[in-house]
């Protein structure tokens, strides 16, 4: 099973409201904040919405 390490690299301040809500729902706050989430379809779908704001790394357990 793998996890995803997600880092916010650009601010969501001037993004669409739906994108700002997605950033907040993933648990990302400020720029350079990082969260580790499970690699599943729901997470991948949310990441596609904000791909231009984040960087993603796979972590093997």
Swiss-Prot record:
Molecular function per GO: structural constituent of ribosome
Alphabetical list of Pfam families matching this protein: Ribosomal_L30
Any single GO CC term annotated in Swiss-Prot or TrEMBL for this entry: large ribosomal subunit
UniProt-listed SUPFAM superfamilies: Ribosomal protein L30p/L7e
Lineage top rank: taxon: Bacteria
GO-annotated biological processes: translation
CDD domains with a match to the protein in the record: Ribosomal_L30
Keywords in alphabetical order: Ribonucleoprotein, Ribosomal protein
Family: Belongs to the universal ribosomal protein uL30 family.
Subunit structure: Part of the 50S ribosomal subunit.
Protein name according to UniProt: Large ribosomal subunit protein uL30
Species this protein is from: Lactobacillus helveticus (strain DPC 4571)
Phylogenetic classification of the source organism: Bacteria, Bacillati, Bacillota, Bacilli, Lactobacillales
């Amino acid at each position: 099973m793998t996890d995803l390490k997600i880092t916010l690299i650009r601010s969501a301040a001037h993004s669409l409201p739906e994108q700002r809500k997605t950033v907040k729902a993933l648990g990302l706050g400020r720029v350079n904040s990082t969260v580790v989430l499970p690699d599943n379809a729901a997470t991948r779908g949310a990441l596609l919405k904000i791909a231009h704001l984040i960087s993603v790394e796979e972590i093997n357990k």
